[in-house]
Amino acid sequence: MWLCALALASLAACTAWGHPSAPPVVDTVHGKVLGKFVSLEGFAQPVAVFLGVPFAKPPLGSLRFAPPQPAESWSHVKNTTSYPPMCSQDAVSGHMLSELFTNRKENIPLKFSEDCLYLNIYTPADLTKRGRLPVMVWIHGGGLMVGGASTYDGLALSAHENVVVVTIQYRLGIWGFFSTGDEHSRGNWGHLDQVAALRWVQDNIANFGGDPGSVTIFGESAGGQSVSILLLSPLTKNLFHRAISESGVALLSSLFRKNTKSLAEKIAIEAGCKTTTSAVMVHCLRQKTEEELMEVTLKMKFMALDLVGDPKENTAFLTTVIDGVLLPKAPAEILAEKKYNMLPYMVGINQQEFGWIIPMQMLGYPLSEGKLDQKTATELLWKSYPIVNVSKELTPVATEKYLGGTDDPVKKKDLFLDMLADLLFGVPSVNVARHHRDAGAPTYMYEYRYRPSFSSDMRPKTVIGDHGDEIFSVLGAPFLKEGATEEEIKLSKMVMKYWANFARNGNPNGEGLPQWPAYDYKEGYLQIGATTQAAQKLKDKEVAFWTELWAKEAARPRETEHIEL
């Protein structure tokens, strides 16, 4: 990747390719924006890149814990050629996620701010003509707590597949998901930011050569969960036309909570606020500085496994909630009722979702010895309650089912990681895909089974298809980073083609690609990796086991609580 303005070596190429002499300027409903042209090796047509375009008013002051408002207009030409700050978050976790997940050659310097409602645009369109290219809007992951748009470079996907790529930001953590469970702070602010960004795309993307009638939303982890939530929301009708969830769906128990009041009170107490009423808490928290809320975030120890406290009292994430606006009911209820946006939907998981990044780098599981006995596994499953929601009574049954077939403590550890991967991602993803299929929406599933050469040296060589691995293929990392293998380059070309075909037609299949079966009652899906082939019934046995276990638990008579009169 070269910037013509910076890289002398590419000057000749710039001239030869007829590189536009003036940088691109595009009209938006709020004012003009100035971008820059960036060339990708092997492509005659440069990509116009616009970084840090505001899609909403800065969510400061009285707009903290409030729905996003339209951006204010400007009369000058706004320079949108530098990366916007990422939304406020724990800087250490934010840096780590960016380092591990970026598809760039080197990570960009990260800044953080509460003023963060910006998006980046990559368009290969000839801006002198009114093109109508498919638009792909990327929603980043990070547990709704960390992450940012600029970690992910849309250049390769845009150039290779002739699509407009938009990467968006949304409020995170306390700023994005603080909820009192009533009208004082309903919550889901980060999801409402995502909706605002999609509205902005509808109003403006035509001027960037994009087709507002062909918008695909795609995201990974909490970004995949967000895509799935947006499909279920009445607010998003006609804002997008296809959807892709990579390793994250609306049924992730870790990212959804029904009762929010107790967590709101914990946050308020930690911030030194009174908790007499919701109004008092919200008023007090709005007066706090960004730094003070950051201190609260760090003290709350989100995104960490607590081995000491009562798992039922612990909180790993601030989450999506039922706010009556974005989500009228719980995701499971909306899915069961089949009343939501019936759009072509692709859902996928990776082979070892709980392989290394989540347990070792993010949540800090005590597994560095590389082995595990059954008793410890059962205890760890119970300590994982905040993210997997398995009751204490079920933990020995579950560990026996997964780990009982071997005495080898190394195998037991691997099987424990498989169990957590199924609970966190595998089972919810298959269940969501089945719901969409049953509702009549065209549905596709995949399992990604490949280890990118860009993986961290700290990661065990045996972990293939870890959480986030598919991003390197989807966003064309082999064309941006150095040192990719030939196999990896081919794989990324194929994956980008599948994803862009889906964005164009609602069907990933195309000439020269292995046939990807629709996810119908035969439950065909695609295994993507060094060998890419169709298979059937992804996680079928695991889903059956957990469904039966939870049904038995639900049918058990609850112990009646003694009520003092």
Swiss-Prot record:
Molecular function GO labels: carboxylesterase activity
Enzyme class: hydrolase
Subcellular location: Endoplasmic reticulum lumen
Keywords from the UniProt entry: Disulfide bond, Endoplasmic reticulum, Glycoprotein, Hydrolase, Serine esterase, Signal
Reaction(s) catalysed by this chain's protein: a carboxylic ester + H2O = an alcohol + a carboxylate + H(+)
Signal peptide span: 1-18
Active-site residues annotated for this sequence: S221 (acyl-ester intermediate), E353 (charge relay system), H467 (charge relay system)
Coarse class of the protein's main subcellular location: endoplasmic reticulum
One CC-aspect GO term: endoplasmic reticulum lumen
Disulfide bond positions: C87-C116, C273-C284
Glycan attachment points: N79, N389
Transmembrane portions of the chain: none
EC number, as in UniProt: 3.1.1.1
Chain location of the short sequence motif Prevents secretion from ER per the record: 565
Subunit structure: Monomer.
Function in brief: Involved in the detoxification of xenobiotics and in the activation of ester and amide prodrugs.
Family membership: Belongs to the type-B carboxylesterase/lipase family.
Protein's name in the database: Liver carboxylesterase 1
Taxonomic source organism: Oryctolagus cuniculus
Lineage: Eukaryota, Metazoa, Chordata, Craniata, Vertebrata
